[in-house]
A protein has these predicted regions:
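Acidic, contiguous segments within the catalytic cores of piggyBac-derived transposases
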Residues: 2-9, 18, 22-50, 56, ...
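Short linear clamp-binding motif
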Residues: 13
């Protein structure tokens, strides 16, 4: 059998060049998707075309205004365009009438897997060491002044004079940079400006200018009495949150970074006063041009900024991070992956982890994460993908589906307990502190018996269902009165989302304080 021929690098490059030259390809860029599509369809001689959406070439540009009608308060549910430019790669017909035999496809370098020892799974459900537990304590014992605060006083604890002064200073600086030397702003103007923004969340009109209209069907005396239309438009034009002269390289959110940091500080001003915490994603609606904009298929909000949120099971936010995509800085890359980095970063605000339990979904959960959190005395539970359990020998899904409803199987390696439960679908949950016992009952509808039946449900799954939805509750509260005032600034949705979240946080504190003082009230 003849041996394989070995090629030199120069010979390989020459061969690739010859194959590439056999296909005529024209590469052109267009500013919009519509123009790119028209160009691709107009070429009758092309064998095909690849349309590529390119990200912006500069992420820290000083210009932050977009070509939208900010007077229109009823935005489209779909973006008119995407970030950056659109590239069209047109493939010409092969001169020989044959497809090329190979293509040179570049792939990103894969993350190197960690060489960690495999756990030894067993049927004995016992941890090698229990995580200590403490009571989280009463919020009023830590902050007794809260019982005398009105809802307005609580909101002022989040949007306080210091934060509003920062907005005043940066807005005046931005106006001077735009050569407007006459623009002035004070904290009182900011208060009225924020009130009008909040008003648009529960009293929305089709167009912004209608708030100052004198027609009886749209007239709102409160708005026109406290601030004129031109003054509101002027403040919205120059409102700013950062100094353009002190930009941060490679930070896509430098215009709102300090604002988000200040809000997180205020969310944590009373400490972490809830026992049950959850971590999940949240979307802020945004249909403009920015490289941090995300698309989530199948979500109620498909286009927008993606937030990672640590919240209580009642919907109080403690820590918020905006996801900007994969970081180019190696220092920001976690050797364990994105989910591990997000969880550990959000939990940095938890000063006494033995007082809390954390829940998250299968995007984050892995055996390595639960083991790392256990070493930090953080009690955590989450749904999990079975390929992240390091060879845990749970029953295969197709076999478990044939078992009776409510059947479950569990394994433990001394650090993590993994359980798989047969419900409507097979569900896998992993925990570093929870247990299977006591096994409870869950009501389910039986199609064969035409009635509700009770099936066994492990304790860890019941606890997960009970405490996981905190971020979803927060998202529902915020969506109820989301501000509708729009702006041409790309960071405006994050700005108004912060205002909205601060109001929800103040309301959740107010509800919790009233429940402490008047326990007969029903929590909402």
């Amino acid at each position: 059998m003849p041996g394989k021929r070995q090629y030199k690098v120069a010979e390989v490059l020459q061969q690739l060049a010859e194959e590439h030259s056999s296909v005529s390809e024209d590469f052109e860029e267009y500013p919009t998707l519509i123009e790119a599509a028209e160009s691709a369809l107009a070429n009758d001689e092309a064998a095909g075309a690849d349309v590529v959406l390119l990200p912006p070439s500069i992420v820290d540009a000083l210009s932050d205004e977009e070509a939208i009608d900010d007077n229109d308060m009823m935005p489209s549910s779909l973006p008119l365009d995407v970030s950056g430019r659109v590239a069209v790669l047109v493939h010409g017909n092969n001169s020989n009438g044959e497809e090329p035999t190979s293509k040179n496809t570049s792939r990103g370098q894969k993350r190197q897997k960690l060489d960690t020892p495999q756990p030894k799974w067993a049927n004995r459900l016992a941890y090698s060491e229990d995580i200590p537990s403490e009571n989280v304590g009463n919020l009023l014992d830590k902050e007794p002044q809260l019982k005398d605060m009105t809802p307005f006083d609580l909101i002022s604890r989040y949007f306080d004079a210091q934060l509003k002064t920062m907005i005043v200073e940066e807005s005046i600086r931005y106006a001077r940079q735009k050569n407007n030397m006459n623009f002035e702003l004070d904290v009182g103007d900011v208060d009225i400006f924020l009130c009008i923004i909040l008003l648009s969340g529960y009293h929305s009109l089709p167009r912004e200018r209608l708030y100052w209209n004198r027609d009886e069907d749209v007239c709102i005396p409160f708005v026109a009495t406290h601030m004129s239309r031109n003054r509101f438009m002027e403040i919205k034009k120059y409102v700013h949150l950062a100094d353009n002269d002190t930009t941060v390289a490679n930070d896509k959110l430098y215009k709102v970074r300090s604002y988000i940091t200040e809000l997180n500080t205020r969310f944590q001003q009373f400490g972490v006063f809830n026992k049950f915490l959850s971590i999940d994603e949240e979307m802020v609606p945004y249909y403009g041009h920015h490289s941090a904009k995300m698309y989530l298929r199948g979500k109620p909000i498909r286009f927008g900024f993606k937030l990672w949120v640590l919240a209580s099971d009642s919907g109080y936010p403690y820590n918020v991070e905006v996801y900007c995509g994969k970081s180019a800085n190696p220092e920001n890359q976690s050797e364990h992956g994105l989910g591990h980095r997000v969880v550990t970063s959000l939990l940095e605000c938890v000063t006494n982890p033995v007082c809390h339990e954390v829940y998250f979904d299968n995007f984050f959960t892995s055996h390595s994460l639960l083991s790392s959190l256990r070493a930090m005395n953080v009690k955590a539970t989450g749904t999990v993908r079975e390929n992240r359990l390091k060879g845990c020998p749970l029953m295969e899904t197709k076999v478990m589906k044939k078992k009776e409803r409510g059947f479950y199987e569990s394994k433990c390696d001394g650090q993590v307990i993994a359980v798989k439960w047969n419900d409507n679908q097979c569900v896998s949950v992993a925990t570093n502190f929870g247990s299977i016992q006591p096994v409870g009952k869950a009501k389910r509808w039986s199609a064969s018996k035409k009635c509700s039946v009770e099936i066994p449900q492990p304790s860890v799954i019941r606890d997960y269902n009970l405490h996981m939805g905190g971020v979803d509750i927060l998202d529902r509260f915020m969506a109820t009165y989301r501000p509708m005032v729009r702006s041409k600034k790309w960071w405006w949705p994050l700005f108004t989302n912060g205002i909205n979240m601060a109001v929800v946080a103040a309301w959740r504190v107010h509800v919790q304080v009233r429940l402490y003082l008047e326990p007969y009230l029903v929590a909402q």
